[in-house]
């Protein structure tokens, strides 16, 4: 089964476009959770058990584990094993290097650690991405329009004869790569709903991973409308801190579940409204 098929199967099973980011911040851990790599496993286990029926995917960010060295990587590997096998897990690592190095990264992420997908940056061109694109059962999400405030410094630069912004040009390139490999998605920040809509118009058939809802200030309704209108592929709405740290008490997992359910249900309501509007055109 391809990565895309597995993703869509989980979306249908859980009626969810919610992707929870597993980004542990020890300083924000609830009462009773050790503030060390072992505590990361305890915390993540509780979050996963509380939300596994509400998500379409999980997305751990490599940096939040790598900062603790070997013990942090061990916590990441254990976290991967804790997630039910039918739920896709995307490693947010933003990788990309010369071909031989990317091949080593691909083996580490897909084979050694067993992740289903990862995020990559396209700055080195298609040669650097080839090792990630070569297997249809693993997903590759290409950074196109990131959610951070400084994204426009580079991503809005005009390119080509038409002078279109770089992020749109990259989206077109990623779509071309997908025609060959079938496993490409895009990363487009929910903090830029106008740009998200433009990317979706160009790439209706590519999955989009949309970070930035919650702590980064993205508007959920605008982002979901932008990412689903004219779409034939999923929009994965990524939320991390506002779910993980919804409560600092011993009932943190229960509160995380409630927060995740609210987001999941809101997305589902908007999705149905968008689908209804499309049906009346």
From Swiss-Prot:
Pathway: Pyrimidine metabolism; UMP biosynthesis via de novo pathway; UMP from orotate: step 2/2
GO terms under biological process: 'de novo' pyrimidine nucleobase biosynthetic process; 'de novo' UMP biosynthetic process
Family annotation (SMART domains): OMPdecase
Enzyme Commission numbers on file: 4.1.1.23
Secretion signal span: none
UniProt entry tagged with the keyword Lyase: yes
Catalyzed chemical reaction(s): orotidine 5'-phosphate + H(+) = UMP + CO2
UniProt keyword terms in alphabetical order: Decarboxylase, Lyase, Pyrimidine biosynthesis
Active-site residues (renumbered): 94
GO MF terms, alphabetically ordered: orotidine-5'-phosphate decarboxylase activity
Enzyme class of the recorded protein, top EC level: lyase
Short name of one Pfam family: OMPdecase
UniProt-listed HAMAP family: OMPdecase_type2
Family (UniProt): Belongs to the OMP decarboxylase family. Type 2 subfamily.
PANTHER family attached to this UniProt entry: OROTIDINE 5'-PHOSPHATE DECARBOXYLASE (PTHR43375:SF1)
Protein name (Swiss-Prot/TrEMBL): Orotidine 5'-phosphate decarboxylase
């Amino acid at each position: 089964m391809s990565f895309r098929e597995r993703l869509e199967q989980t979306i249908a099973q859980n009626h969810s476009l919610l992707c929870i980011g597993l980004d542990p911040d020890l300083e924000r851990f609830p009462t009773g959770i050790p503030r060390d790599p072992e505590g990361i496993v305890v915390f993540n286990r509780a979050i996963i058990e509380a939300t596994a029926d509400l998500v379409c995917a999980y997305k751990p960010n490599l940096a939040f584990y790598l900062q603790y060295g070997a013990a942090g990587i061990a916590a990441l590997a254990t976290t991967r094993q804790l997630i039910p096998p039918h739920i896709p897990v995307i490693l947010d690592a933003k990788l990309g290097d010369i071909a031989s190095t990317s091949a080593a990264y691909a083996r580490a992420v897909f084979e050694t650690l067993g992740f289903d997908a990862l995020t990559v940056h396209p700055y080195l061109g298609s040669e650097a991405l080839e090792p990630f694109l070569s297997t249809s059962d693993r997903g590759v999400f290409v950074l196109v329009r990131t959610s951070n405030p400084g994204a426009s410094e580079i991503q809005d630069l005009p390119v080509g004869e038409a002078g279109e912004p770089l992020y749109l040009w990259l989206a077109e390139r990623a779509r071309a790569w997908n025609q060959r490999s079938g496993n490409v998605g895009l990363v487009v920040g929910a903090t830029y709903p106008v740009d998200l809509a433009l990317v979706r118009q160009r790439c209706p058939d590519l999955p989009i991973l949309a970070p930035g809802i919650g702590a980064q200030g993205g508007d959920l309704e605008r982002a979901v409308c932008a990412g689903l209108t004219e779409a034939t592929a999923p929009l994965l709405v990524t939320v991390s801190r506002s779910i993980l740290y919804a409560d600092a008490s011993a009932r943190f997992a229960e509160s995380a579940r409630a927060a995740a359910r609210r987001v999941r249900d809101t997305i589902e309501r908007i999705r149905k409204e968008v689908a209804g509007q499309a049906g009346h055109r």
